[in-house]
């Protein structure tokens, strides 16, 4: 099976369907931005603050539904900053819960392989008593940082695929 491109970043990429969601939605003051750098990589950077019970920044991408029945994993080429992030997916964009996979990063380019069945359901940080993600449908992906500490971060993305 051929890989399913979810997003391939380049200098001409349209970021209109990528949206920042920071802890301001619950009174926090963390700040982040998402843009294309001079090499055409998606760049997610910002500052996490714990003020006002905050502590997270996220960038999400919403798209037309993808059926991933014969797919076994997500493959993400990225360059991190040595910090831990979460990859989140939603079966339907209106779902309140996401399926989550935490992963560490290095300061070098790396490819993270995420087995679909290891994405677990959670809502507001609490694991839910539901089955893990099954790949039947995909309408949203999110990258989130929220390590319960104040920190700056910078995360580059080259490509996101399902294989």
Feature roles, as predicted:
Residues 1-163:
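Beta-rich carbohydrate-recognition modules and glycan-binding surfaces
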């Amino acid at each position: 099976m051929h890989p399913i491109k979810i997003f391939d970043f380049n200098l001409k990429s349209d970021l209109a369907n990528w949206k920042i969601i920071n802890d301001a939605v619950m009174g926090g003051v963390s700040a982040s931005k998402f843009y294309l750098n001079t090499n055409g990589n998606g760049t997610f950077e910002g500052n996490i603050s714990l003020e006002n019970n905050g502590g997270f920044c996220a960038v999400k991408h919403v798209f037309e539904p993808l059926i991933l029945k014969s797919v076994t994993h997500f493959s993400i080429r990225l360059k991190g900053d040595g910090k831990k992030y979460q990859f989140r997916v939603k079966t339907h964009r209106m779902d309140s819960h996401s399926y989550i996979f935490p992963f560490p990063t290095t300061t070098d380019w790396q490819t993270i392989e995420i087995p679909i069945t290891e994405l677990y359901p959670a809502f507001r940080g609490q694991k839910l008593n539901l089955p893990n993600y099954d790949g039947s449908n995909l309408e949203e992906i999110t990258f989130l940082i929220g390590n319960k500490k104040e920190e700056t971060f910078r995360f580059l993305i080259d490509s996101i695929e399902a294989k």
